[in-house]
């Protein structure tokens, strides 16, 4: 059946509140946040919504809803300026899962590494192939932050090394590290669903014996590694900097992403005293901060 979609423009300060209002007061069946350049909002932490400064709020309604009444309710909420910009359109029902699967293709990162959906054939059987079914966890390689981390891993000599994937999501970085030569990877995530997805994808790639996953409260005491990769968010990267740096052996290498270009310097300041930092790498307004721990 067709649906009605209403798109509103908001800021990161009020977008989530507007989304709540649309769900609770106007009868929206779903609300999606996009940035104003139509880039999907990826990788929210549980209980936290990741938003850009200029955010579109997209609400979906059943086709028989009265759009004029909905717009009156939005106006009456006083959450948007007088004469607020909006777009109303009808969208056809789709098999969204099938459409997503059809558009998820094998992707190459760096010189050797391919990320391949588990339902497609690998394009190069001789390459380093990671077979992936992300399920409900973040991490497919399609987002610039994941791509930045995969390219960084591909450029390292991981032979025999221990790696920590801090915020492991689907396990894509952990599995890639094993496939690229690491002896062992420890995945840490606050979301139990991510740990399940990481385990499933590790088994799919035949590396389940080399990957351990933990909630932060369950990780082994004194855990340190040769390499740490943390593709999370700028806020946690700042707040958890003592913990993240503590996971790294002296001389070990660290890469962090999930950082917008406007946030990069503020994140780097939390690591500059303890690491020799590389030049910041950028891709589509997203950044990777990397370096080697001093000592």
Swiss-Prot record:
Q: What is its EC number?
A: 2.1.1.-
Q: What is its main location?
A: cytoplasm
Pfam families per the UniProt record, alphabetical: PrmA
Subcellular localization(s) per the UniProt record? Cytoplasm
Stretches that traverse the bilayer: none
Q: What class of enzyme is it?
A: transferase
Which family does the similarity line name? Belongs to the methyltransferase superfamily. PrmA family.
Question: Do you know which Gene3D superfamilies this protein is assigned to?
Answer: Vaccinia Virus protein VP39
Its protein name is Ribosomal protein L11 methyltransferase
């Amino acid at each position: 059946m067709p649906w009605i979609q209403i798109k509103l423009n908001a800021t990161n300060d009020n977008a989530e509140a507007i989304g709540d209002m649309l769900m609770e007061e106007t009868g929206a069946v779903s609300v999606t946040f996009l940035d104003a350049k139509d880039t999907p909002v990826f990788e929210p932490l549980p209980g936290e919504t990741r938003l850009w400064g200029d955010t579109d709020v997209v609400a979906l309604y059943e086709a028989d809803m009265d759009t004029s009444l909905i717009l009156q309710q939005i106006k009456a909420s006083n959450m948007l300026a007088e004469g607020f910009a909006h777009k109303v359109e009808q969208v056809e029902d789709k098999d969204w899962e099938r459409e997503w699967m059809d558009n998820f293709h094998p992707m190459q990162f760096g010189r050797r590494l391919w990320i391949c959906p588990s339902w497609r054939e690998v394009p190069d059987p001789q390459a380093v192939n990671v077979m992936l079914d992300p399920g409900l966890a973040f991490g497919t390689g399609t987002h610039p932050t994941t791509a930045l981390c995969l390219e960084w891993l591909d450029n390292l000599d991981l032979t025999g090394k221990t790696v920590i994937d801090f915020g492991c999501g689907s396990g894509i970085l952990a599995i890639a590290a094993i496939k690229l030569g690491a002896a062992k990877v420890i995945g840490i995530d606050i979301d139990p669903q991510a740990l399940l997805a990481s385990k499933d994808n590790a088994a799919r790639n035949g590396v389940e014996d080399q990957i351990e996953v933990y909630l932060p409260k369950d990780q082994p005491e004194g855990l340190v590694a040769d390499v740490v990769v943390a593709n999370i968010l700028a806020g946690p990267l700042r707040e958890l900097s003592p913990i993240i740096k503590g996971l790294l052996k002296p001389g070990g290498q660290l890469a962090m992403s999930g950082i917008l270009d406007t946030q990069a310097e503020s994140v780097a300041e939390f690591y500059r005293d303890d690491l020799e930092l590389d030049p910041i790498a950028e891709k589509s307004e997203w950044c990777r901060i990397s370096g080697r721990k001093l000592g």
